[in-house]
A protein has these predicted regions:
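Domain-scale recognition of soluble eukaryotic interaction modules
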Residues: 2-3, 54-108
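Hydrophobic/aromatic-rich, well-ordered segments within soluble, folded domains that form packed cores
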Residues: 36-51
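Short, charged/polar surface micro-motifs in flexible loops or helix N-caps
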Residues: 31-32, 48-53, 63-65
Length: 108
């Protein structure tokens, strides 16, 4: 988790750790495009064994879409969060925070 936090901080993101869930939260993430463009959210990434295993999806707060649709479900982080299950392709070729952020940018 510390290495992912170091990489995200190096590219300008403010982060917080939730160690009991092995989640690294990007604070004040601004959505760049799509129906939620310009909204600011928190994005949680599973980071327990980064860079060996990619995040299986993201945790988002506040909720942007209804739970139970498009692989979006309740998050263990609390009622204001939701979990978006999304596969991160090409992890074997690029195991970096930049690769994760490029992938997250396509979600919204």
């Amino acid at each position: 988790m510390d290495e992912l936090e170091r990489q995200l901080n190096a590219i300008g993101f403010k982060t917080n750790q939730i160690p009991e869930h092995k989640i690294l939260v990007i604070e004040d993430y601004t959505i760049e495009a799509g129906p939620h463009a310009s909204k600011t959210v928190r994005v949680g990434l599973s980071a327990g064994d980064f860079p060996y295993t990619p995040p299986a999806g993201i945790h988002v707060s506040p909720k942007l879409r209804p739970d139970g649709q498009n692989n979006i479900n309740a998050s263990p982080l609390g009622n204001e969060w939701q979990y978006w299950s999304r596969r991160l392709p090409d992890w074997g070729k690029d195991r970096s925070a930049r690769h994760i952020i490029a992938h997250v940018n396509r979600f919204f």
